[in-house]
Amino acid sequence: MITHRSNNVQYEVTPPSVEEDLGPQFEFYWTRQKDPHSIRRKLILAKHPEVAKLCGPEWRTKYIASAVVLLQLSIAYALKNTPVLSFKFLALAYVVGATANQNCFLCIHELSHNLAFRKPLHNKLFAIWVNLPIGVPYSASFQPYHQLHHKFLGDEVLDTDLPTPLEATVLSSLLGKAFFATFQIFFYALRPMMVTSIDMTFIHLLNVLVCLVSDFILIKFGSANSLWYLILSSFFAGSLHPTAGHFIAEHYLLDPPKHYTQFQDVPPLETYSYYGMLNLFTWNVGYHNEHHDFPFIAWSKLPLLRTIAHDFYQPLPKHTSWVRVIVDFIFDENVLMYNRVKRETAKDKSVDSKTTKTQS
């Protein structure tokens, strides 16, 4: 009972049970604990030292990626006289184009880890070639930002995969999440530049120049519709498309804990894998715990890594459908833009010029 001190009226108040679900938490899941990947990597190598032999480039990558690039450029040329808003044009852009461009996005992801060639420069140059069907320059900037994501997972400043506080505040409603899921490609393209700066290099300039020349040639010998096909393919690949589910599935908490004390509780699992058939089109990016544990193992050997270290990966929660991930993300009221594990940037944690220059 509580008695109001001015009118002596008594109120009966029942405090919530410790076990009661208090609803969604409108705050990130802050922790000071180290991310689990480096810890698990050491444990796996200690128990399964043969895993180290899986590291290194995959020779087939360049041939598969080149076939996808040529497929997209061929379709773009073939659609030069097809109206952009026609069913044929939009259906091809969504079904074939988005799947192919998602493949290009994720091949560039492989190349950012130098997993197609032994020399970093060769991977960077090949990434510019794989970038052509995307329609806008992308590959040169992706690599340094993605390396920061791996090295500083969850860092409030250096991990630009994290939504900003403004995004989390504005977009955590049903409509906000639907907007984010529909236009997430723009968030992933623009957010890094607004959060963390990197040095511009000759590779960036070459990426822009080659992409512009490619677009010009495509318009000259095809038409503007040809370029629109590539742009729409890229948009659909980062929108409400089955393969786009990986963007959300990788690190968002879709089953958040009912209670969490910031900086005190053990953080929930912050990386999730998916082992379904869409990995066939996406360079096995669904093997995401495996990838973060061993970022220098190529896509083709991640299933073998999981088999060897089955005792480590089998107990981990996983997704069974990227489409289900998108649906749950939008419609589950307990899933917010805040549902990410986040870490403070330590004062002595900095990115020197060598980190950005050698990786950009």
UniProtKB/Swiss-Prot annotation:
Disulfide bonds: none annotated. A motif (Histidine box-3) lies at residues 288-292. It holds the Pfam family Lipid_DES. Its EC number is 1.14.19.17. It comes from the Eukaryota. It is found in: Membrane. Its main location: membrane. GO terms for molecular function: sphingolipid delta-4 desaturase activity. A motif (Histidine box-1) lies at residues 109-113. One of its GO terms (cellular component) is membrane. It is a multi-pass membrane protein. Pathway: Lipid metabolism; sphingolipid metabolism. A motif (Histidine box-2) lies at residues 146-150. It catalyses: an N-acylsphinganine + 2 Fe(II)-[cytochrome b5] + O2 + 2 H(+) = an N-acylsphing-4-enine + 2 Fe(III)-[cytochrome b5] + 2 H2O. InterPro entries: DES1/DES2, FA_desaturase_dom, Sphingolipid_d4-desaturase_N. Keywords: Lipid metabolism, Membrane, Oxidoreductase, Sphingolipid metabolism, Transmembrane, Transmembrane helix. It is an enzyme of class 1 (oxidoreductase). The chain crosses the membrane at residues 67-87, 89-109, 125-145, 170-190, 202-222, 228-248. GO terms for biological process: ceramide biosynthetic process. Belongs to the fatty acid desaturase type 1 family. DEGS subfamily. Delta(4)-fatty-acid desaturase which introduces a double bond at the 4-position in the long-chain base (LCB) of ceramides. Required for the formation of the monounsaturated sphingoid base (E)-sphing-4-enine during glucosylceramide (GluCer) biosynthesis. This is Sphingolipid delta(4)-desaturase.
